[in-house]
Swiss-Prot record:
GO molecular function: antiporter activity; proton transmembrane transporter activity
Gene Ontology CC: one annotated term: chloroplast inner membrane
Cited function: Contributes to K(+)/H(+) antiport activity by supporting proton efflux to control proton extrusion and homeostasis in chloroplasts in a light-dependent manner to modulate photosynthesis. Prevents excessive induction of non-photochemical quenching (NPQ) under continuous-light conditions. Indirectly promotes efficient inorganic carbon uptake into chloroplasts.
Family named by the database record: Belongs to the CemA family.
Primary residence: plastid
Sorted UniProt keywords: Antiport, Chloroplast, Hydrogen ion transport, Ion transport, Membrane, Plastid, Plastid inner membrane, Potassium, Potassium transport, Transmembrane, Transmembrane helix, Transport
Any one Gene Ontology BP term: potassium ion transport
Cleaved signal peptide residues: none
Membrane topology: Multi-pass membrane protein
Cellular compartment(s): Plastid, Chloroplast inner membrane
Reactions the enzyme catalyzes: K(+)(in) + H(+)(out) = K(+)(out) + H(+)(in)
Claim: Ubl conjugation is one of the keywords in the record: no
Listed name of the protein: Potassium/proton antiporter CemA
Length: 229
């Protein structure tokens, strides 16, 4: 009976982790063709913001310069000039197709994120009992660990999140979140978040160590500072 009570929260935790991902993946696979067809037939204009327009314009100018340089190196003839115009036209269409596909993927990502949020909200509303059991199991597991293991785990986690090499990881993660939620890649915004978010986390961690760990387990704080030094 005790094993069954322990197994139910673990099964619940597994469903929290994998069910939103599985439903989102199934939704993406089943709705991709419909969204693509709707977007290609229902949209008569291409919607671009300033960042997207600047990016496409820069790529187009770069492409045009490369093709012109290629033609300058080769023989000048009317046929080659016609081929140059055809090449620019084809590459322009390709750029528009890529932008169109990015917009479709943005719609799909945004839809799947909304679905995942709704599912997780349902878990938090209707699964209070299971969440309480999971919380108690997690606290019991952490309580049984030695202070050395706890200090090492905290140090490892902080080095991964706010260590010397963490900005690159934060940049990739924030860029991925930007893409998933349909935002356009913005280097300035991402750089600002990368430079401020780890600092905020570091401040919160120090506050937590000072207010909570000093009161609950002073020996853990001593071991943590010894390892950190």
């Amino acid at each position: 009976m005790a094993k069954k009570k322990a197994f139910t929260p673990l099964l619940y935790f597994a469903s929290i982790v994998f069910l939103p991902w599985w439903i989102s993946l199934s939704f993406t696979k089943s709705m991709e063709s419909w969204v693509t067809n709707w977007w290609n037939t229902g949209q008569s204009e291409i919607f671009l913001n300033d960042i997207q327009e600047k990016s496409i314009l820069e790529r187009f100018i770069e492409l045009e310069e490369i093709l012109l340089l290629d033609e300058m190196i080769k023989e000048h003839s009317e046929t080659r000039l016609q081929k140059l115009g055809i090449g620019i036209h084809k590459e322009t269409i390709q750029l528009i197709k890529i932008q169109n596909e990015d917009r479709i993927h943005t719609i799909l990502h945004l839809s799947t994120n909304i679905i995942s949020f709704v599912i997780l909200s349902g878990y938090s509303i209707f699964g209070n009992e299971e969440l309480v059991i999971l919380n108690s199991l997690a606290q019991e597991f952490l309580y049984n660990l030695s202070d050395t293991v706890k200090a090492f785990s905290i140090l490892l986690l902080t080095d991964l999140c706010i260590g010397f090499h963490s900005p690159r990881g934060w940049e990739l993660m924030i860029g991925s979140v930007y893409k998933d939620f349909g935002f356009v890649h913005n280097d300035q915004m991402i750089s600002g978040l990368v430079s401020t978010f780890p600092v905020i986390l570091d401040t919160l961690l120090k506050y937590w160590i000072f207010r909570y760990l000093n009161r609950v387990s002073p020996s853990l704080v001593v071991i943590y500072h010894s390892m950190n030094d």
